[in-house]
C-alpha cells in the first residue's frame, strides 16, 4: 500500500494565504500525495502549479455548512471543474437529513454528481452532528446518488472522524463506494486506525507529519 496516495493534503482555513497554498502544493509534490484540497478560490492557481504533476486538485462545495441551495452547489461544482478541479468534496443538506427529507438530500447530491461530469465526488455527511441511524441513512443516500465516496467531516463542526463512524459507513456502503476520513487525523496512529476501519482516503492537514511517522516506523 502506498500510504501517500491515500492522503488529500488539506488546507481549508478561511485565512489561507497564497504562500500557505504554495507550501502544501510543494509538500504534496514532494511526498506524492493523492491531492491537495483547497477552497474554490485557490483551485485555478493550484491547478496551474500542479499541471506537470500527478497530484490532483480537490476542492469543497457548499462548505462547511452544506446549507447552500442545490442550484448553488451545482454551479459551484461546474465553476470548480472549469477552473481545474479534479475532485469535489460536497457537504450534504444536514437539516434536510434530520427532517427526514431524504429525497431532497439525495437530489442535492445527484445535482453535484451531474455537475461534476465524471469527476470524483466525495460527500461529507458531518458525522459529529448525526446519530447512528442518520449516519447509516446518509451513507445509503450517498451511494444511491451515485457519488464515489462518503466522507466523515468538514473539520469545522467541533469534531472529526472516528474509527467507529468510518467502520459504520464502510459496513453500510460495502464495496460499491469508498470512505474518506477527515477531521482530527493528526498522526500515524490516527491514520492507521482510519485505514484499518475501512477508509481508503484520508483528508488531513498533517500529511507531512503522517509520512514522517511512517518513515520513522521500523515496520514500514
Curated annotation (Swiss-Prot):
> Which SUPFAM superfamilies does the UniProt record give?
Aldolase (SSF51569)
Catalytic activity line of the entry:
2-deoxy-D-ribose 5-phosphate = D-glyceraldehyde 3-phosphate + acetaldehyde
Keyword Mitochondrion present in the record's keywords: the answer is no
Q: What does this protein do?
A: Catalyzes a reversible aldol reaction between acetaldehyde and D-glyceraldehyde 3-phosphate to generate 2-deoxy-D-ribose 5-phosphate.
Entry EC number(s): 4.1.2.4
Spell out the catalytic residues.
89, 151, 180
Keywords annotated in UniProt? Cytoplasm, Lyase, Schiff base
Q: Which family does it belong to?
A: Belongs to the DeoC/FbaB aldolase family. DeoC type 1 subfamily.
Biological process GO annotation list? 2-deoxyribose 1-phosphate catabolic process; carbohydrate catabolic process; deoxyribonucleotide catabolic process
Q: In which pathway does it act?
A: Carbohydrate degradation; 2-deoxy-D-ribose 1-phosphate degradation; D-glyceraldehyde 3-phosphate and acetaldehyde from 2-deoxy-alpha-D-ribose 1-phosphate: step 2/2
Q: Which domain of life is it from?
A: Bacteria
Cited PANTHER family:
DEOXYRIBOSE-PHOSPHATE ALDOLASE (PTHR10889:SF1)
Q: What name has this protein been given in UniProt? A: Deoxyribose-phosphate aldolase 2
Gene Ontology CC entries for this record: cytoplasm
> What is its subcellular localisation?
Cytoplasm
Which InterPro entries does the UniProt entry name for this protein?
Aldolase_TIM, DeoC, DeoC/FbaB/LacD_aldolase, DeoC_typeI
Which SMART domains does this UniProt record tie to the protein?
DeoC (SM01133)
Return one GO MF term. deoxyribose-phosphate aldolase activity
Amino acid at each position: 500500500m502506498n500510504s501517500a496516495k491515500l492522503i488529500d493534503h488539506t488546507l481549508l482555513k478561511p485565512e489561507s494565504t497564497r504562500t500557505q497554498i504554495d507550501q502544501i502544493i510543494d509538500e504534496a509534490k514532494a511526498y506524492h500525495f493523492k491531492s491537495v484540497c483547497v477552497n474554490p478560490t485557490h483551485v485555478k492557481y493550484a491547478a496551474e502549479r500542479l499541471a506537470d504533476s500527478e497530484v490532483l486538485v480537490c476542492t469543497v462545495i457548499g462548505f462547511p455548512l452544506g446549507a447552500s441551495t442545490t442550484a448553488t452547489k451545482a454551479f459551484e461544482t461546474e465553476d470548480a471543474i472549469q477552473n481545474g478541479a479534479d475532485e469535489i468534496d460536497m457537504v450534504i443538506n444536514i437539516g434536510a437529513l434530520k427532517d427526514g427529507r431524504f429525497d431532497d438530500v439525495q437530489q442535492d447530491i445527484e445535482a453535484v454528481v451531474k455537475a461534476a461530469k465524471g469527476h470524483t465526488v466525495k460527500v461529507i455527511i458531518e458525522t459529529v452532528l448525526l446519530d447512528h441511524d442518520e449516519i447509516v441513512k446518509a451513507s445509503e443516500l450517498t451511494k444511491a446518488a451515485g457519488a464515489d465516496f462518503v466522507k466523515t467531516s468538514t473539520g469545522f463542526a467541533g469534531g472529526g472522524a472516528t474509527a467507529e463512524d468510518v467502520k459504520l459507513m464502510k459496513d453500510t456502503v460495502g464495496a460499491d463506494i469508498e470512505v474518506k476520513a477527515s477531521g482530527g487525523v493528526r498522526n500515524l496512529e490516527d491514520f492507521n486506525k482510519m485505514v484499518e476501519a475501512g477508509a481508503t482516503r484520508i483528508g488531513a492537514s498533517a500529511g507531512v507529519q503522517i509520512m514522517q511517522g511512517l518513515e520513522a516506523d521500523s515496520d514500514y
